[in-house]
Amino acid sequence: MQYLISSLIFLIPSLGMLAGLSAAATVTIFLLISFLRGINRHCERLQGVWQSSNNVIPWLDHGIQKIQKDWIPLQAHGITMLFTAWCFISCLFAIHLINSLATFTQVFILLFLGFAVSNSAPFQNRLQLKKALIFGILTAILLFFIEYSSNGFLTRIFKTSFALYMLDRGCALLSITAWVAIIILLSNGKKRHTLMLYILVLYLLSISDSLASFLGFGIGGVIFILTRFMKPIFFKLIAISLITGSLLFPVIAKQIEPQDLSEKYLATQPSAAHRLFIWHFVANKIIEKPILGYGLASSKYIKAGDSEMIDYNGEKWHPLPLHPHNNILQITLELGIIGLILFLCLVYKYLKQISNLENKNFKAISYACFINYYIIGMISYNIWQIWWISSGIWVLVLMKLLVKPDIVIDN
């Protein structure tokens, strides 16, 4: 089982570069194997207890103490359970009930599995697993440059054509996974290697087609530095900025003039221009159902009339293709203001948990990775996409079970 975990830790970032959607499958397998590992360890411990009757009572006492200890964190998950409950309730008045319930079930099972694994015992043989992760990331970087310089040599083995945007998901996965490797190197005193890896990944993202990943990783680096130099007030600063910006975003999206902005600043970037039109359209739709929203996973079923279609430089664009390409707008559109408030409460909660970490480097990297993931979600991807949720859980599990046990006393 240890070999399987090591192989998957290497495979997820490397295979993910060529096929980003593969993370939905590979991370799920990784979580299932890790979950079974925890069950096996528990069964072995239980078997050892029953072999010696003298150990039964102490083991029961320990179990009761553990339940009492874990009950406090369980109570602290009240806001999480409220958000989950509201997501389920929103399915009941969604545009497409069956699809919404199916999406909710998939996301809930994946998040529950990720939560269970991330709160299990740390990995054994962590040095070997850390090496596997770093080699996996380096392999992903190598594969990107092979595809970039050869016009998709490997991709064209399986597909008829290649375009650089096909690596966007892999770049997004790399941008958040690289932070795990960075903290591993930094905690081992390899500052030069840390800087080299950051610059290499930043350069890779700058020549890729994934602007969201480049911005997320670049701003993540700035966040890392600010965390180290603004220790006393950084949590308040980042929390206020994120929450205020998120609350104002739907208002700003409503007020913008996408046609004028696109012609002035985005004439050569049609993809970015299209997003402005999408955000403006979504903001107007939010006004129609501001409190409850349209229901979870309803974005792609919202109809647009002929008069709402976008005519941009002779091209016809749909004002809402599948999803809003912005997590805040999608949450507000589908779950309403109620869902947005609950979501931002979760954001505050996780930022507060990061601020409570004692290790300075681990805290700074955690902030950077969180902001990286958040920014990508503000520009790209459906918030309910399984591969993207899996990517976030993957990094969380690595940080908690692979990195944290060696450098942080859990406070």
Curated annotation (Swiss-Prot):
Q: Which GO terms describe its cellular component?
A: membrane
Q: What is its main location?
A: membrane
Any Pfam family from its record, for instance, is: Wzy_C
Swiss-Prot/TrEMBL keywords:
Membrane, Transmembrane, Transmembrane helix
Would the keyword Membrane be found if you checked this record's keyword annotation?
Answer: yes
Where in the cell is the protein located? Membrane
Disulfide feature: none
Please indicate which superkingdom the organism of origin belongs to: Bacteria
Q: Does rRNA-binding show up as a keyword for this record?
A: no
State the annotated membrane topology for this chain: Multi-pass membrane protein
Q: Which residues cross the membrane?
A: 15-35, 78-98, 101-121, 133-153, 166-186, 207-227, 233-253, 328-348, 361-381, 383-403
InterPro entries in the cross-refs: O-antigen_ligase-rel_domated, WaaL-like
Family affiliation: Belongs to the O-antigen ligase family.
From the Swiss-Prot or TrEMBL record, give the protein name.
Putative polysaccharide ligase RC0486
- Originating organism: Rickettsia conorii (strain ATCC VR-613 / Malish 7)
Could you read off the lineage of the organism from its UniProt record? Bacteria, Pseudomonadati, Pseudomonadota, Alphaproteobacteria, Rickettsiales
